[in-house]
Curated annotation (Swiss-Prot):
Enzyme class: hydrolase
Any single GO CC term annotated in Swiss-Prot or TrEMBL for this entry: cytosol
One Gene Ontology molecular-function label: magnesium ion binding
Enzyme Commission code: 3.1.13.-
Extent of the signal sequence: none
Binding site for Mg(2+) 1: 27
Role of this protein: Trims short 3' overhangs of a variety of RNA species, leaving a one or two nucleotide 3' overhang. Responsible for the end-turnover of tRNA: specifically removes the terminal AMP residue from uncharged tRNA (tRNA-C-C-A). Also appears to be involved in tRNA biosynthesis.
InterPro entries per UniProt: Exonuclease_RNaseT/DNA_pol3, RNase_T, RNaseH-like_sf, RNaseH_sf
Pfam families: RNase_T
Source lineage: Bacteria, Pseudomonadati, Pseudomonadota, Gammaproteobacteria, Lysobacterales
Keywords: Exonuclease, Hydrolase, Magnesium, Metal-binding, Nuclease, tRNA processing
Family named by the database record: Belongs to the RNase T family.
Name recorded for this polypeptide: Ribonuclease T
HAMAP family hit by this protein: RNase_T (MF_00157)
Amino acid sequence: MMNQSITPPTHPPMSQRFRGYLPVVVDVETGGFNWNHHALLEIACIPIEMDDTGRLYPGEVTSTHVIPAPGTDIDPKSLEVTGIILDHPFRFAKEEKLALEHIFTPVRATMKKYKCQRAILVGHNAHFDLNFLNAAVTRTAYKRNPFHQFSVFDTVTLAGMAYGQTVLARAVQAAGLDWNAADAHSAVYDAEKTAHLFCTITNTWPLVVAG
């Protein structure tokens, strides 16, 4: 039998694409704007995956509603925006520490799959999501946070560079993607749209490797 040579991939693996970081889209819905005082109410995350050609695509979404942590506040106006009904019988909210474990478990599994060292949060106004995530980690004394504590990929910046748009709805549409305003302000929907936006931009502008 003739030996058949295997052509190596021409793209870097995920473990090298972002310096060992796995991009993970996170979107949170909250009881206000102050992460030190307002409650985390809903969180969704989507690890970014890579196909055999090096193109990025959104992985599976994981989400949960969150029981407001003791001592945190909720601005009623925030509930008007998100449409969250705290006592809805089908909300099935988890306590904050269990919610974090629920979200972080698939992140760690995807990191292992791609041999990445840490996760890096991708978000639209990403530091808002990261600050609420870090506040929850601190409140619960969670010890296995896979995310970098301060570095992010912000799709506001990326979309501004790529399309001249910074509002999520407008950026998504400028990228040629669908947007339904009625579904916005759900952590799952916003995370899905942010993930597709990030992948569209990243796949459109190929990696330039310094020679």
